[in-house]
């Protein structure tokens, strides 16, 4: 919450509804500070997204801080100068990065990937598989390149230990 409070316009995506609720509660309630998760009914989610989109269109310096679960990662056309994403699979991190400087108006912008305490992260098997797939691809590569995503998913899905086994 402290890091998010340093930014006037920021999006933070976390892995669970509980984390979204707790982080939102710790943010200063100034300007437009929003929580988005499936704890909300669909009508309230739509209303909140509409409020957010309208606020982002306004070029004032109003504070806009949003804490959301993954529901904002795909199919939501929003643009923030700074995005924070709790550690997750590469696909989720890249979806979150797609909400950062989406329109290219801000020059270089930053997406930060962070970890919370162990009890707030993805299930161990899921996180381990995602990390192994990421590490196997190496460093210094273009994570947005289609061939990199293909390689990532091949590595991820060949590791059956992260999936349910009957």
Pin down the residues of each PLM region.
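C-terminal helicase lobe and adjacent C-terminal extensions/tails of nucleic-acid helicase motors
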Residues: 2-9, 13, 18-29, 33-49, ...
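Conserved P-loop NTPase nucleotide-binding/switch module
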Residues: 75-77
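Conserved two-lobed SF2 helicase motor
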Residues: 57-73, 85
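Short hinge/gating elements
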Residues: 79-83
């Amino acid at each position: 919450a402290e890091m998010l409070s340093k930014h006037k316009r920021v999006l933070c995506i976390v892995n669970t509804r509980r984390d979204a609720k707790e982080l939102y509660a710790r943010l200063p309630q100034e300007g437009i500070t929003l929580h988005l998760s499936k704890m909300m009914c669909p009508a309230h989610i739509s209303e909140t997204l509409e409020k957010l989109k309208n606020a982002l269109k306004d070029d004032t310096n109003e504070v806009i801080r949003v804490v959301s679960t993954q529901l904002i990662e795909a199919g939501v056309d929003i643009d923030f100068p700074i995005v924070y994403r709790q550690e997750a699979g590469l696909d989720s991190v890249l979806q979150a990065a797609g909400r950062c400087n989406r329109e290219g108006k801000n020059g270089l912008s930053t997406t930060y990937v962070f970890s919370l305490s162990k009890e707030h992260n993805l299930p161990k098997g899921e996180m381990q598989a995602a990390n192994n797939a990421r590490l196997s691809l190496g460093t210094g590569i273009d994570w947005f390149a289609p061939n990199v995503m293909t390689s990532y998913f091949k590595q991820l899905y060949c590791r059956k230990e992260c999936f349910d086994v009957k």
